[in-house]
Curated annotation (Swiss-Prot):
Active-site residues (renumbered): 306
Protein name: Nicotinate-nucleotide--dimethylbenzimidazole phosphoribosyltransferase
An example molecular function term from Gene Ontology annotations: nicotinate-nucleotide-dimethylbenzimidazole phosphoribosyltransferase activity
Pfam families, alphabetized: DBI_PRT (PF02277)
Gene name for this UniProt entry: cobT
Catalytic reaction equation(s): 5,6-dimethylbenzimidazole + nicotinate beta-D-ribonucleotide = alpha-ribazole 5'-phosphate + nicotinate + H(+)
Its job: Catalyzes the synthesis of alpha-ribazole-5'-phosphate from nicotinate mononucleotide (NAMN) and 5,6-dimethylbenzimidazole (DMB).
EC main group: transferase
CDD domains: DMB-PRT_CobT
Documented EC number(s): 2.4.2.21
Superkingdom classification of source: Bacteria
Amino acid sequence: MSASGLPFDDFRELIRNLPGPDLGAERAVREREVTLTKPAGSLGRLEEIVAWLATWTGKRTPQVNRPLVAVFAGNHGVTAKNITPFPPSVTAQMVENFAAGGAAINQICIANDLGLKVFDLALEHPTGDITEEAAMDERTCAATMAFGMEAIAGGTDLLCIGEMGIGNTTIAAAIALALFGGTAEDWVGPGTGSTGELMQRKLAAVRLAVALHQPHLQDPLEVLRCLGGREIAAMAGAILAARMEKIPVIVDGFVASAAAAVLYAANPEAIDHCMFGQVSAEPGHRKLLAKMGKEPLLDLGMRLGEGTGAALAANIVKAAALCHSGMATFEQAGVSASK
């Protein structure tokens, strides 16, 4: 903890002083790219992905050998306002399903040869109902961010961030509204299927929560504390830890992007090592990516969460790295280069 004794101060200092890009590694990748047996630029965005990998790993021949999907699960007190068709008990049930190998993310990880870790964040203790009180106190929020930083402890060279939590699209919408303004209608979507009266209650909850906590919402970490969830705080911590350890990150959908948005609002450079795996069908996600100036890799109409979009995108990143490292140069292959 910092000398001031305030739990967030260490994170504020960290966010202000993050390691920057390795421009030498990026330059080396771009120089090799033009020597490979293909027309310059013909692999399109794959070439930019390799440059991004080099920039944030510091490796001149970037590889992806230990990709990991980290899924963070949390529960939310605001679900007591009857804003979602599923009860909060589903969060714990889905965590058990992940452990048993029965969820969509398990199958995608098998298909793409990705590691998977699931983090259960005190599911029996939901965060505070944000329409009545702060989601967390500062100490709890900071401790949860620190817990999220441990996601990389086992070693990985590409971190995919995902989540599970009934009610957390409401939380993500409230965070987006607090950070970027607009109206609740700009950010609130159906989530797991909220329509009709459920949708109206969801909209009302977001409006009420942002109005209630307005005096605290000038500081992005206070936005996280007042309106966030444990899984969102943990994802923010994981993103920061990855930056410190030169690990590129693929962010999944709307909720995971809300965690990244908190860091972006504190320092726009804090998520430069992040790629956004997909734009989800949740309507606020496309707007949120636009606010951060981010272009997603995939647009498949998905809105499941669980890290599924990030995991699918990881295979594209793996392929990009292999194309760069494995392709022969014109000289090696005896192929004539362009004039």
